[in-house]
Amino acid sequence: TLMQLLEEGRNVVLLTSFGALTNRVSIQDIDIKDIAKQADFFNVPLCLVPLYPNTDYKKRIEEAFKVIEDKTGLQVKRLVFGDLHLQDIRQWRIKTWAEYEVSTPLFDVPYEELLSRLWKLVTDKNLAISLSTEIKLPNASFPIGTRFDAELVHKLGDLGIDQMLENGEGHTLVMPKQRNQ
């Protein structure tokens, strides 16, 4: 999604909310320092939105939109999400952000195509993908840091797990490879 927007010459700002008490993206369990490294690697501005317990999520995000507009001089018109097939989440986003164009360009794209594009991006940009959360199953376990590659995707499929982890079975972290890898 990000690469496509950048290739189209779009003005892109990466907006990420995180737990203010943990400095981590809550569900994915990713440290905001890693989010900053991603933004730097892809050369996109980053807007971090700290969320405290009992925070009004929509209000905080809208405040961030205002900051982005003030800093860039551009109006936020379109919100882009990487959702793959969870219709309830997509509909929530569309309803919550009704005053914006909500785009989900990866929605319902077949996994074979998504994975092909992902592996090409990993190679072209020299990226590494690993699990940012542990996957615990009755007959298998994959710890944090496990490489998310074609072999793991195949294993997940054999275990009846969504190969893109779209149902919350686990989450991934994409980072530039270290020079010595």
Predicted regions: what is each one?
Residues T1-Q181:
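Nucleotide-activated chemistry modules centered on ATP-dependent adenylation/adenylyltransferase
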